[in-house]
Curated annotation (Swiss-Prot):
Listed name of the protein: Hemoglobin subunit beta-1/2
Domain Globin, first and last residues per copy: 2-146
GO molecular function, one term: heme binding
Keyword Oxidoreductase (UniProt): no
Pfam families the UniProt entry points to: Globin
Family: Belongs to the globin family.
Assembly and binders: Heterotetramer of two alpha chains and two beta chains.
UniProt keywords, alphabetically: Acetylation, Heme, Iron, Metal-binding, Oxygen transport, Phosphoprotein, S-nitrosylation, Transport
Function: Involved in oxygen transport from the lung to the various peripheral tissues.
GO CC annotations on file: blood microparticle; haptoglobin-hemoglobin complex; hemoglobin complex
Amino acid sequence: VHLTPDEKNAVCALWGKVNVEEVGGEALGRLLVVYPWTQRFFDSFGDLSSPSAVMGNPKVKAHGKKVLSAFSDGLQHLDNLCGTFAKLSELHCDKLHVNPENFRLLGNVLVCVLAHHFGKDFTPEVQAAYEKVVAGVATALAHKYH
């Protein structure tokens, strides 16, 4: 993903303030609530019957943290997202059969959650940089599908 030096600085500065566990759990939870068809990949997570059940589910929170930890690793390798996410792409494509559109949806939800958590600090410029990053990550995760 191509970011200007200012965009890279903005992404990294904000990411340094992100609580990966909290934001990850909220982002994955919102994905499962807003796009309920994505729940089919999480049958083993137990009760996902209502928004409050999803948002309070410890397995959702734990997996959200895992997802955002991987995203965090990707931020260290913005020039090689396909390489960074190659194994996860293969897993989600070949074994889990996740629709690659779901990566884009999760990226959009993550941007919303970051905006909610950071308010005025999540300026339009910061949002634009994050939009580039989540699009790049979604493309990298979908790489094995092509």
